[in-house]
């Protein structure tokens, strides 16, 4: 499990582990947010090679699974939040952090 603290517009890595490619629904990412983020509907974005994958945390969610579509290499991860009740388009964002995925030893078609 990887753990992160989101404070204002910065993501701090609290616990890091080695991530291997070819996983499916195996790597959990857990988030803690400061009070500024409480009202927001939260989404985690993973970007690799011009592809972006969104994982919805919602307003109460604190964890998500690493997208299986990601492969070995660097991945940029950021969080954004929005207030669905704010008609003026309030949005919170973070500076991305880099996660490194290592090539796994998996061979097969499972």
List each language-model region with its residue ranges.
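N-terminal assembly/attachment segments of tailed bacteriophage virion structural proteins
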Residues: 1-108
């Amino acid at each position: 499990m990887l753990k992160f603290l989101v404070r204002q517009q910065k993501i701090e890595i609290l616990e890091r582990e080695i991530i291997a490619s070819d996983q499916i629904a195996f790597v959990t990412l857990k988030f803690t947010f400061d009070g500024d983020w409480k009202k927001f509907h939260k989404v985690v974005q993973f970007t690799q090679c011009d592809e972006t994958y969104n994982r919805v945390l919602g307003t109460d969610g604190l964890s998500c699974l690493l997208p299986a579509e990601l492969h070995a290499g660097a991945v940029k991860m950021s969080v954004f939040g929005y207030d669905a009740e704010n008609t003026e388009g309030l949005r919170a964002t973070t500076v991305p952090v880099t996660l490194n995925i290592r090539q796994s030893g998996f061979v097969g078609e499972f």
